[in-house]
């Protein structure tokens, strides 16, 4: 083999090595560019999907007001007062003679004191009929007392000549209904408190 041929082969080998090296570097660079582009697109889509905050709504059950619960009388249960056996639906046990019980004024359902008190701490309705538990008492306005007195005096003075109706005037003797802890909520609807919590979106 001539010396010139050996030199040509050496140069050819060097060129082949450089060619492989160049193509390898090019492949790595192109791969990195493609990976960075895909990562940018994924981050952009993630930001669009998680823009702002995540809202969580928590509904909290609220029981009846304490003074309403205290207004419900506690009685000693007597089976002789009932034709059928009564069962406390909270504990699923029968009411027995001497048991301390409460009867809900809005629906006349009976329960053990401990059971219904625990129930009404987180609920405002009857466990059986779901009717709202509250007390409603009626009373006459204070100023009606004076009107009634003057009306009776006038009636006594003129009773010899005129005959008056025994029914009181509608516009003066209308009783006021006091709210017994019911508020303006509808009967049968539990009190729910909605709490909205804003949580910043977690960046990935």
Swiss-Prot record:
Transmembrane domains' residue ranges: 14-34
CDD domains, sorted: RING-H2_EL5-like
Primary enzyme class: transferase
Region (Disordered): 142-174
Key words, A-Z: Membrane, Metal-binding, Transferase, Transmembrane, Transmembrane helix, Ubl conjugation pathway, Zinc, Zinc-finger
EC id: 2.3.2.27
SMART domains on file: RING
Membrane topology listed for this record: Single-pass membrane protein
Subcellular location: Membrane
Single Gene Ontology BP annotation: protein ubiquitination
Gene Ontology molecular function terms on file: ubiquitin protein ligase activity; zinc ion binding
Catalytic activity field: S-ubiquitinyl-[E2 ubiquitin-conjugating enzyme]-L-cysteine + [acceptor protein]-L-lysine = [E2 ubiquitin-conjugating enzyme]-L-cysteine + N(6)-ubiquitinyl-[acceptor protein]-L-lysine
Gene Ontology CC terms, in alphabetical order: membrane
Pathway of action: Protein modification; protein ubiquitination
ZnF endpoints (RING-type): 88-130
Family the UniProt entry places it in: Belongs to the RING-type zinc finger family. ATL subfamily.
Entry domain remark: The RING-type zinc finger domain mediates binding to an E2 ubiquitin-conjugating enzyme.
Protein name: Putative RING-H2 finger protein ATL61
């Amino acid at each position: 083999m001539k010396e010139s041929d050996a030199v040509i082969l050496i140069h050819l080998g060097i060129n082949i090595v450089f060619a492989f090296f160049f193509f390898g570097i090019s492949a790595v660079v192109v791969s990195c560019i493609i990976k960075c582009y895909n990562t940018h697109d994924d981050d952009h889509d993630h930001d669009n999907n998680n823009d702002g905050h995540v809202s969580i709504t928590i509904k909290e059950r609220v029981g009846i007001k304490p003074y309403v619960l205290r207004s419900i009388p506690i009685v000693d249960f007597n089976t002789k007062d009932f034709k059928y056996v009564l069962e406390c639906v909270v504990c699923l046990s029968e009411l027995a003679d001497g048991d301390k019980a409460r009867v809900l004024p809005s629906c006349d359902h009976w329960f053990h004191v401990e059971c219904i008190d625990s129930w009404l701490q987180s609920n405002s309705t009857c466990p059986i009929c779901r009717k709202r538990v509250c007390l409603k008492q009626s009373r006459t306005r204070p100023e009606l007392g004076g009107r009634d007195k003057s009306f009776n005096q006038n009636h006594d003075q003129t009773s010899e000549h005129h005959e008056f109706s025994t029914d009181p005037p509608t516009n003066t003797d209308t009783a006021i209904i006091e709210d017994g802890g019911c508020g303006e909520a509808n009967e049968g609807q539990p009190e729910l408190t909605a709490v909205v919590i804003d949580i910043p979106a977690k960046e990935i």
